[in-house]
Amino acid sequence: MERPQPDSSMPQDLSEALKEATKEVHTQAENAEFMKNFQKGELTQEGFKLVMASLYHIYVALEEEIERNKENPVYTPLYFPEELHRRASLEQDMAFWYGPRWQEAIPYTQATKRYVQRLQEVGRTEPELLVAHAYTRYLGDLSGGQVLKKIAQKALNLPSSGEGLAFFTFPNIASATKFKQLYRSRMNTLEMTPEVRQRVLDEAKTAFLLNIQLFEELQGLLTQKAKDHDPLQAPELHRRAGSKVQDLAPTKASRGKPQPSVLSQAPLLRWVLTLSFLVATVAVGLYAM
């Protein structure tokens, strides 16, 4: 009598099953407007401060629940506080971005609160689901997070020494690739029933959806603030701009002497026009390719 063959479409390892189960929501998170702008380097200091403050609240909640359950066999194999925990690093970043009284200054948005509440609920009532949240956060930080660090450093003109970006640095991990392999292998040793395993997979999707809601909220806040500070509503800016144009206007020339052009009197303007021409040329060339 032949034994029934296992369903080859369902990954046997938990790490692979998580990757497969979250593929669609992972793509949705990457395509959120906030993240698309981030990936393109269209990042403002205000937007970066907002997302970093949200991450601070999220990681405080996550790591408090991890500490609560560090001796619980449903999580113990994944307990790597020295290598992974982000709270101390985020506290450094909060001080950099918000100043010495940062605890009184950082925002706490509604989507962030919902994320925190879910982490607290899981840690206290269903600690086995912490695996899903640790997977989505820490492995993401060790992967795409390193790319985002470089983008933020360039877009915000941050020092190469890493101030303001401690969150993205893992000084106790020599090789991110090897550590991720170790972490996944530990995940695959966790013993759980098929029912618990499915709940872990579902919770990983929930974690991504919480991130998507956060990105949408942050983008909405930035968009609203941009509208509130529309330069078209700032007459003082128009007055100053008008005065600069007046300064560049040609003066009455002496008889018999040619009047210098605006460009010859304004080397900065001449440089900007030249640079604009070069950028347009490069853009057209790339489009043609």
Swiss-Prot record:
Its EC number(s): 1.14.14.18
InterPro entries with a match to the protein in the record: Haem_Oase (IPR002051), Haem_Oase-like (IPR016053), Haem_Oase-like_multi-hlx (IPR016084), Haem_oxygenase_CS (IPR018207)
Cytoplasmic compartment residues: 1-266
Superkingdom of this protein's organism: Eukaryota
Pfam family, one: Heme_oxygenase
Compositional bias ranges of the Polar residues kind: 1-12
GO BP annotation list: cellular response to arsenic-containing substance; cellular response to cadmium ion; cellular response to cisplatin; cellular response to heat; epithelial cell apoptotic process; erythrocyte homeostasis; heme catabolic process; heme oxidation
Residue ranges of the region described as Disordered: 1-24, 239-261
Site label Important for catalytic activity, positions: 141
Catalysed transformations (reactions): heme b + 3 reduced [NADPH--hemoprotein reductase] + 3 O2 = biliverdin IXalpha + CO + Fe(2+) + 3 oxidized [NADPH--hemoprotein reductase] + 3 H2O + H(+)
Family affiliation: Belongs to the heme oxygenase family.
Note on domains (UniProt): The transmembrane domain is necessary for its oligomerization.
Protein name per its UniProtKB record: Heme oxygenase 1
